[in-house]
Regions:
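A short, exposed helix-loop element centered on a Lys and neighboring polar residues
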Residues: 338-339, 384
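Canonical Rossmann dinucleotide-binding motif of NAD(H)/NADP(H)-dependent dehydrogenases/reductases
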Residues: 205-235
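Residue(s) in the substrate-gating loop at a strand-loop-helix junction
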Residues: 359
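Short C-terminal tail/terminal secondary-structure segment
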Residues: 309-312, 464, 475-491
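Conserved glycine-rich Rossmann-like NAD(P)H-binding loop of the short-chain dehydrogenase/reductase
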Residues: 232-246
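Catalytic Tyr-X3-Lys loop
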Residues: 319-335, 355, 372, 379
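Alpha-helical segment proximal to the catalytic Tyr-Lys
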Residues: 343, 388-392, 472
Length: 491
């Protein structure tokens, strides 16, 4: 019998323009992640190339998928079979698709439990997570799931191999899956279970996907490195896309590209990617999250460290356009990012975190930074309002730095020199920027109660604390990380 996925168009069960889903994947992927992550969170890999679409769109696709894979090494990742969603993509009806996915998952879990009960032996390990690791959807392709990006890519790679085995078998005769008892004895092999039990404990942020806005420099860059160290996958985002990519490249260079040869486009990525985004443009932010869904399948935390300081002109006046620019980034931009992220979290139905960056200036009134200070005061209250609006699904908190000069794009050389001049600190304009920055940082340190410079790493540590279980019951709170500025004490 000919393999129907190779006989286009005669072998197609559905016919879609260009073979791909004619509705956006963004509403579907996070929904699936939430459904399969009821026990433990998963990271996804999406494959929607021509080969995969021919399979999921074919007449024989559902039946072949039901037979499962035939290689023991494969179904340790892919499980005994994938979930094939019974849906007509020509309709483009998202709600019908969601219902089909939910119903399919209920049946899949029942089938897996029945398979376990039917095949288990007296000494078999306890049943593992009954959720599928491979989901096949006509018109959309395949979404593979794993505890991290490498595992989901390997799972996707293995199912690609399974499709090739099916194609070859169907081309010459008929494909047959492995006997279920034999498959079970391999999947629940005591030595395999022993290997799983010897695995090191998961890190605190394992299985999580964090989006960091402002990751091109300073606090954002430091935070990206900090959360990856704890197991998170990181989407490094910046208005300067090259800077965002540079941060992601640093992470990949340190931790490696991962394993597994699968995933279409951006989904064939490692533990970090770098993307550009204008946080004041809702379309740009929505596009960012759509890309994140394709890359990793969902989000668990969104951290905004991007901000802007615009000094007044020589007369001490802030022009209207510069006022709008400051509030556009420090307040409106933070709100747009949080609002678009909230939409994703509601689709996932998984709890998560949003962390903003405000400032000690939010509560300290002074001359020379009118637009910045008032925008940060607004950002402080934005945190509280969002915490109320987005509870109980999300915790919303912030860190409030003060005078983080090192690595900050808000302290370019000219501003550092202006500040040194303002405070009558001796310097020579021939000095390197790093030396000038250190002088200013040390000056600011002397004004604090702890007498220590405040660096990006200090903010990153506070952000990690808010992300962690240690402050898992804290929301609507701003943590000052300013060395102790008594004028900045929150009241």
């Amino acid at each position: 019998m000919a393999y129907t996925t190779c006989t286009v168009p005669a072998g197609e069960k559905v016919s879609i323009s260009a073979g791909k889903l004619n509705v956006p994947a963004n509403p579907i992927i996070p929904f699936i992640r939430g459904q399969v992550s009821v026990n433990r969170r998963f990271v996804g890999t999406v494959q929607d190339d021509g080969k995969m679409l021919r399979f999921v769109n074919s007449v024989d696709g559902p039946g072949l998928a039901e037979l499962g894979t035939s290689c023991p090494d494969h179904f340790l990742r892919t499980k005994i079979k994938p979930l094939f969603v019974n849906w007509d993509p020509a309709s483009g009806d998202i709600e019908t698709l969601k219902t089909a996915i939910a119903d399919g998952l209920v049946q899949y879990r029942e089938d897996y439990a029945a398979y376990y009960d039917r095949c288990k032996r007296p000494d078999s390990p306890a049943m593992r997570d009954p959720n599928p690791t491979v989901v096949l959807i006509p018109g959309l392709g395949m979404i593979a799931w794993g505890k991290n990006k490498s595992e989901s890519r390997v799972t996707a790679e293995f199912y690609n191999c399974a499709i090739e085995v099916m194609r070859g078998a169907q081309a010459i005769d008929k494909y047959e899956g492995m006997d279920q008892q034999e498959a079970f004895d391999i999947e629940y092999w005591p030595l395999e279970e022993a290997k799983l039990q010897r695995m090191p404990p998961e890190k605190e942020l394992d299985r999580q996907i964090h989006v960091i806005i402002g990751a091109g420099a300073g606090i954002g860059k430091e935070t990206a490195h900090r959360v990856v160290k704890e197991g998170a996958h990181v989407v490094c985002v910046d208005k300067d896309e090259a800077a965002a990519r540079a941060t992601a490249d640093e992470i990949i260079a340190k931790y490696g590209p991962g394993i597994g040869v699968a995933g279409t486009g951006v989904s064939n990525c490692g533990v970090a990617i770098g993307l550009g985004c204008d946080m004041t443009d809702r379309q740009s932010v929505a596009k960012l999250f759509e890309t994140v869904m394709l890359a990793y399948g969902g989000i668990d935390a969104v951290i905004v460290t991007a901000g802007v300081f615009v000094p007044p002109d020589k007369s001490g006046h802030v022009e209207d356009k510069m006022w709008d620019f400051t509030f556009g980034i420090n307040v409106k931009g933070a709100y747009i990012v949080a609002d678009e992220a909230h939409k994703i979290f509601k689709k996932q139905r998984l709890t998560g975190n949003i962390i903003l960056t405000t400032s000690a200036n939010a509560v300290v009134a002074k001359k020379g930074s009118l637009a910045y200070d008032t925008s940060k005061a607004a950002a402080n209250h934005l945190v509280r309002e969002l915490a109320i609006e987005m509870a109980p699904l999300l915790r919303v908190n912030a860190v409030a730095p003060a005078t983080v000069v090192k690595g900050s794009t808000m302290f370019p050389r000219d501003r550092v020199i202006a500040s040194l001049t303002k405070y009558d600190i001796a310097f020579d304009e021939s000095e390197e920027t790093d030396a000038l920055t250190e002088k200013l940082s040390n000056f600011y340190a002397k004004r604090s109660l702890t007498q220590t410079p405040i660096e990006p790493a200090d903010q990153a540590e506070a952000i990690f604390l808010l992300l962690s279980k240690r402050l898992g019951k804290t929301t609507g709170h701003i943590i000052p990380v300013d060395g102790g500025l008594q004028d900045g004490f929150l009241r």
